[in-house]
Amino acid sequence: MPENLLPAGIALLERGWLSSNNVVCTGRHGSAVIDTGYAVHADQTVGLVRHALADRPLDVIVNTHLHSDHCGGNAALQAAFPASRTLIPPGEADAARAWREGLLSHSGTGQLLPRFRVDGVLPVGESIALGEHEWQVYPAAGHDPHSVILFAPRHRVLVSADALWENGFGLVFPELVGHAAFDAVQATLSLIESLQPSVVIPGHGPAFADAASALARARSRLAAYRKDPKRHARHAARVMIRFKLLELGRWGRAEFEQWFDAARLLQHLHAEHFASEPWPGWRDALLEDLQGAGAIALSGDLIINRP
């Protein structure tokens, strides 16, 4: 969807799967960026945000949730724009302020996240002025129990984060650690439907206008996961491997096995869903799945990401 269909004062910096999209808001209420990508792209994020702001300062950094691909650029942006304020969802504010890594998701998935400063929390259930527009802040549990979405009602623009993509939604992380959350996904999809957005800016991928079709696809995927939670768990394990390969490009087999064996979320997935499969065999089977899908190449002791 061409960016010129977004109203003035909202710019989408479309990234990829390693880094979330960044949404730059400018206007009479100052300037803000919503979500900041992954740590290894932090310098690029700073450059992209500077370019989008032109000569303006960055006043506010907003995170829809604290997964590493959505807040990994926070520290770099804080260093580049020291007067900026960082607002996060309230559910993880205490853990982030004290930097209790065991309570933040990146430690369990073996991902990178530089520590950043927390200046305040988003007003869930209320509105916040960012750039030219007023944004309503809604709770959007499911993908993450503390996630929020932001909706600008004047132009019906929705920043959906990972609650809704054009083709699905993000992994349902609470389900992966034994907490029921498929009902929360369903409730969030119903909330999005009730807002009737004219434009959806997802956490990954281009903005899109056909929310109804995206919701239908998301509900179909949710039904499949409800029917077979093991399918969701296996998909999650593959996604974790692929995400790390997007970061590294290539991996020595020994280094991969060290990372895999230490990842707490993978340990939990195996114990919960795949305990009948020996750990080394399960690990190898996941690589074979990814190779069969054309996502990676195996060459001797190297594991290589394929674009």
Regions found by a protein language model. Give the residues of each.
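Metallo-beta-lactamase
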Residues: 31, 38-40, 134-229
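Active-site HxH/HxHxD metal-binding segment of metal-dependent hydrolases
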Residues: 40-43, 50-130
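Conserved beta-strand hairpin/beta-sheet module of binuclear metal-dependent hydrolase folds
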Residues: 2-56, 149-162, 166
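Short Gly/Pro-enriched turn/cap motifs at secondary-structure boundaries
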Residues: 13-15, 117-119, 139-141
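Short, exposed beta-strand/loop patches in secreted or surface proteins that constitute
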Residues: 1-5, 294-297
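C-terminal regulatory/interaction regions
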Residues: 233-307
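Soluble or luminal CAZymes and related metallo-dependent hydrolases
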Residues: 41, 120, 180-184, 278, ...
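Short Pro/Gly-enriched beta-strand edge/turn motifs at strand-loop
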Residues: 4-10, 106-110, 131-133
